[in-house]
Amino acid sequence: HDDHGHKKKDDHDDHDDHAHGEYDPHIWLDPINAKIILNEMVEHLIENDSKNTSTYKSNLDKALKDIDKLVKDVKAELNQSTSSIVFHDAYQYFEKRFNVNVLGAFTVNTDVMPGAEQLAEIREKIEHDKVSCIFSEPQFNPDIINAVAKDMDIKTGVLDPLGSNLNPGKGLYFDLIRNMSKSFKGC
């Protein structure tokens, strides 16, 4: 994810200061940001296609209500989150919106995999902080996650921040956020 501005960071304890460069590009993982994006999109659509203004506004109103319900449902589902470590440092928007307790990441830059020393530190962190789950992503080989989890009392799960395994369609975004919620909840 070099094109995302990811930089190598050795310490992931402070999740208020993610190492995404100046901006974290994973804005879609907070549904409130999705509402802002939708409002902007509709504004531009209306500017360029004013004859369909009422349709755009009607669709926007429905989408905003659906997002509000999504946020409420996910907050209720994740009301007792356990601690986890994620594959890469991409989830701060989701973490902050839904109070998810992510204690670290295997890598900040997905082009640079962690070495033996960093993996040992992660195993130590898992034991010390009583991390209950570590997550891989479908876009990347889970061997590192499985190697760390081997011989440890820890669950593994999959987070898909891109929705790579979802079918395209009008429910895609909602499925993406719900699936992330289910992954955190189930792990």
Describe the residue ranges of each PLM region.
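Extracytoplasmic metal-acquisition and chelation regions
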Residues: 1-187
